[in-house]
């Protein structure tokens, strides 16, 4: 299932291959509950996000498992990232999902903290649409902020997630 990493790469995750097909690349984020890596599906060559959390960490009740379940229950709606796989790998909970682009906060800062009125209206409409969809499925997102809205990548770069 997981192959131990022998060389020292730019990531701190101890496994290089997950679920026999996802190659872990570099660390792209770290939070209080876990670490996010970019990776590649070795079958399709698609770039993915690999979220990890240590199993049994303090103040943690399988947050990734809950996230995987919730995202899977919302699948198919524009702006909900795809979940490819969730599982446990020797001391870690691991969620493999669609890799997204920059957060709204990053884009706002990149634009010198100014969005046009048209951009604000489009983003507000997309945010409301997403939040309504999530609420219609009895899920309450308790951390709504620009850092938690992401844009897509490639041919999906105009989609808000």
Task: Give residue ranges: language-model regions.
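Conserved N-lobe ATP-binding subsite of Hanks-type protein kinase domains
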Residues: 35
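Conserved N-lobe loop of protein kinases adjacent to the ATP-binding glycine-rich P-loop
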Residues: 40-47
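Conserved beta3-strand ATP-binding lysine motif
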Residues: 51-55
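Short beta-strand micro-motifs within the conserved protein kinase catalytic domain, predominantly
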Residues: 82-93
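Activation segment signature within eukaryotic-like protein kinase domains
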Residues: 123-124
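Catalytic-loop of the protein kinase fold
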Residues: 135-153
